[in-house]
Design a protein with these regions (language model features):
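Positively charged, small/polar-rich N-terminal and surface patches that mediate targeting and assembly
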Residues: 1-110, 115-167
Length: 167
């Protein structure tokens, strides 16, 4: 089962939320890979807010969503250099990371989608659907080594996000 990371960036702060809602309404079959989605928004002061694309009970237990939140935090936040080096060494494209971060300048938003080709879901169909909306589409493969690293990293990231939210 291969994994693909699809990120759609928008030059408007609330556009990612609007697009996600529209895609969910127009979705006619489970072929779209929308089970694991994270939404990132950047306000005028440059603060990035990350949240799951869905709010089901037990979202913290959804491994893929937690992985996406960690990865989005690494790409858009002020990450530790060793974490960036580890995921680049694991095979994540540094150019991809730089391009996504660059597109999130000013007030902006993004959808992070983890698309797993598993015989039911189709990453190509997901990309085609997202391309209907006026944003910038970025995609890369997500190697198993990066997923393994993020699995350990995600719990530390989620804990730090919860601490920041409660302050």
């Amino acid at each position: 089962m291969s994994s693909e990371l699809i990120v759609m960036t928008f030059p408007f702060r609330h556009k990612a939320e609007t697009v996600l809602a529209a895609v969910r309404v127009m979705r006619k079959s489970p072929i779209l890979c929308l089970g694991s989605v994270a939404v990132a928004t950047k306000d005028p002061t440059g603060e990035v807010t990350l949240r799951p694309g869905e709010e089901p009970a037990g979202v913290q237990e959804n491994r893929d969503t937690a992985l996406l939140l960690s990865l989005a935090g690494l790409i858009l936040g002020d990450p530790a250099q060793e974490a960036v080096d580890a995921i680049v060494a694991g095979g994540l494209d540094r150019q991809f990371m730089s391009e996504v971060a660059r597109r999130m300048a000013g007030e902006s938003s993004a959808l992070f989608v983890l698309a797993r080709e598993d015989g039911v879901h189709d990453a190509g169909e997901t990309r085609s659907t997202l391309a209907l909306f006026r944003g910038r589409l970025h995609q890369t493969s997500l190697p198993p080594e990066v997923e393994a690293y993020l699995s350990g990293y995600e719990s530390r990231f989620v804990e730090s996000q919860a601490t920041q939210t409660n302050q």
